Amino acid sequence: MKKIISLLVCMFLLTSYSITAQKYKRKKQQNTTQFEEKYYDAMQWRNIGPYRGGRSAAVTGVANKANLFFMGATGGGVWKTTDAGNSWENISDGFFGGSVGSVAVSEWDNNVIYVGNGEKTVRGNVSSGDGVWKSVDAGKTWKHIGLKNSRHIPRIRIHPKNPDIVYAAVLGDLYKSSAERGVYKSINGGLSW
């Protein structure tokens, strides 16, 4: 008798769950806005860049400038757009290239940009980098400011009111022990860590 009651309770619970799920699915479908195909059938996809960038996991915007974004590519340096992505310009060529794991722009002074080299997506084949780079003129020029053997820097954070205070999360060598690994702090704009 206990088995029959248990079986009936289970069937009841499963049935009520199924009914609830169907109601939710129908409700969700009713709220979907659909547009007639004539409004978008002439549209065509196009690549707006950046070109030769490779994959990217390092993208940041600038809080008070809605159309300004920076992107760090795994195989193509740092790119900048001032028109919300319609066009891109490489701003690191001639200074550094290769793999970028993080890009940070100061909220206090948008001309100050820090870049951490080295891919941050840990995979079988990753590109390493050579530390932290800094620009004080919105990417026109760059200076290497340390952590040369860090290899992979997935995150950089800048103090919101003082661009000289910066933190860098450093992975170091992914496949063996590494002297440069951990969270580093600079209080002098990267002169020392």
Question: Model segments located where?
Answer:
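Beta-propeller blade termini and top-face loops
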Residues: 17, 22-193
